[in-house]
Regions:
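Phosphate/pyrophosphate-binding betaalpha-module
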Residues: 1-6
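Adenosine-phosphate binding glycine-rich loop
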Residues: 54-137
Length: 137
């Protein structure tokens, strides 16, 4: 285990060779080489939070092509989401997080969530921070 914390059921570990079951695979790097690829399964949510430029890739084509891809910014993703760009996924098969959350739930499918950053979310966070500062005086 890499990290111990206040959550006894949360175990952070390096990827093991061979087959291993993970609930969540989370990548947050600026790697230019693929860090994780496996057969996509509905048991594991893969979330790519790095790779925000076309030349950066964390998650490989096995996951991207084998998963329902959901992005936080459907306008920015086609020019920023290196994992999806390099895998050659058809953009008509990539959905937005907003549509995914408000739509009808699908049967169990593998999901790859890709975040490239979203200025609207950043602006909302700034608004909350500013309101807190004003309240504190």
């Amino acid at each position: 285990m890499l990290l111990r914390g206040p959550y006894p059921n949360l175990h952070l570990q390096k990827e093991l060779c061979g087959k291993a079951a993970y609930d969540l695979v989370l990548t947050i790097t600026s790697s230019k080489e693929m860090l994780y690829d496996n057969i996509a399964t509905s048991d594991t949510l893969v979330s790519g939070l790095g790779a925000y430029r076309p030349v950066i890739v964390e998650v490989g084509p096995g996951i991207v092509e084998g998963s329902m891809c959901v992005v936080d910014d459907p306008v920015g993703a086609p020019v920023k989401a290196g994992d999806i760009i390099q895998a050659g996924k058809n953009w008509s098969q990539v959905g937005s997080l907003a549509d995914h959350l408000t739509g009808t739930p699908r049967e169990m499918v593998s999901v790859f969530f890709k975040s490239v950053g979203c200025a609207a979310r950043d602006l909302a966070a700034c608004g909350v921070a500013m309101a807190g500062m004003i309240e504190l005086g």
